[in-house]
């Protein structure tokens, strides 16, 4: 993880690491009910679980994000290996949600490193006092990765449904335990940056307008993608799936959408 942070944000959130899984998603209909799909399912599921476990032992912010990326790529491959309509929808939505939230986190870590001289999460104590606006950007990015009602949780909800409908309880267990494992490192990160320490001086003066523009744009994109995900699904994902599978239907029931809408309202309040 020695590349400049903007390069890491570009390569490890939305371009290089997504190139391979993009091809696997394109092959998703052909992977259903065969040995290649079964291998992809279990390799992806095991990768998701063990990469999540590996992230717990890391304190370098970029390494935590790197292992988290590997974990989510494993989940995408696992969903694509199932080959079902619901699993394909889930894989595509994970790609979208992950791209914006993880880009925000990589750039936030880079900005913190520039101001603090370190990207070690253990040294992020009191970031809320020293750089409150940057801290807010990090909170939004972390929330986008694992908290309700942000995008990744929506995708994992849909993944659970896809695994159950496909009759793969072992994959469901890997998803549940792997998702539970992510709580450890994201909660640790949140606890560090939200801790309040008296007497710290403000350090945001050195952050340029260009950096703020990028961070705030990605923060709003993380929120907007979550709120507008039904429209993204209806006008972006479902037309592709209609061409690929020949039919469309709702992956997440209307009642669940209402629950998620209430979560958004409570979050705003």
What are these regions (language model features)?
Residues 129-135, 186-269:
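Cytoplasmic/organellar membrane-interface segments at the starts of transmembrane helices
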């Amino acid at each position: 993880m020695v590349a400049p942070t903007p390069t890491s944000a570009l390569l490890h959130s939305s371009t290089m690491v997504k190139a391979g899984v993009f091809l696997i998603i394109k092959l998703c209909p052909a992977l259903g009910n065969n040995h290649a799909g079964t291998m992809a399912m279990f390799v992806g599921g095991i990768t998701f679980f063990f990469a999540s476990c590996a992230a717990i032992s890391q304190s370098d912010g970029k390494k935590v994000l790197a292992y988290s990326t590997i974990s989510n790529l494993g989940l995408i491959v696992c969903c694509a290996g199932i080959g079902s309509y619901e699993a394909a929808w889930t894989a595509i939505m994970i790609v979208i949600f992950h791209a914006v939230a993880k880009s925000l986190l990589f750039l936030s870590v880079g900005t913190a490193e520039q101001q603090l001289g370190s990207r070690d999460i253990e040294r992020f104590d009191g970031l809320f006092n020293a750089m409150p606006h940057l801290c807010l950007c990090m909170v939004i990015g972390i929330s986008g990765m694992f908290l309700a009602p942000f995008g990744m949780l929506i995708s994992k909800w849909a993944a659970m449904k896809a695994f159950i409908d496909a009759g793969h309880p072992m994959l469901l267990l890997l998803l549940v335990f792997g998702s539970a494992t992510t709580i450890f490192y994201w909660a640790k990160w949140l606890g560090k940056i939200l801790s309040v320490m008296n007497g710290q001086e403000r350090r945001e003066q050195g952050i340029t307008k260009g950096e703020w523009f990028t961070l705030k744009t990605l923060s709003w994109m993380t929120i907007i993608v979550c709120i507008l995900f039904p429209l993204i699904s209806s006008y972006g994902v479902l037309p592709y799936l209609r061409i690929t599978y020949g039919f469309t239907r709702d992956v997440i029931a209307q009642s669940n959408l209402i629950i998620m809408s209430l979560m958004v309202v409570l979050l705003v309040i």
